[in-house]
Amino acid sequence: MKNERLIGAWRKILQMKPENPTIEICPGITRRTVANGETMYQMLATLAAGSRMPEHSHSQEQIVHILEGKMRLIVDGVPHELSNGDSFYLASNVPHGVETLSATRVLDTFSPPRKDYLAIDEKVRQEVL
């Protein structure tokens, strides 16, 4: 019974992924929802070389894992250079920004979920229909 529940959840994630749109967050930076649940949200972000995410903050905690590329994370005015395989954690409401040093792909996980992003996904899906 326990395995059936896990398999059902896994199927839901696999079925959801293909319908998620790619959304531009800001020039040169796109995101695509990978999965979400009641307490977490995960997305794949693609950042063009030289792109910049201005300083911002959000109420969610965030964990970022760099899949490929190189970026400069700026927290409290202090730059941190990160590359393939690096991960970092940001607490709620911590101002941060990013500058890419090469084309970069990251896996972002937020808790609680980014309901704002999910609402945009749904709006885009409805516009396509």
Predicted ranges, named:
Residues 63, 70-72, 79, 95, ...:
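Structural motif
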Residues 1-39, 119-129:
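A short, N-terminal "cap"/entry segment at the start of jelly-roll beta-barrel domains
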Residues 92-116:
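Ligand-binding loop in jelly-roll beta-barrel domains
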Residues 77-92:
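Short acidic-glycine-tyrosine-enriched beta hairpin
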Residues 67-68, 83, 102:
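A cytosolic small-molecule/anion-sensing beta-strand core signal
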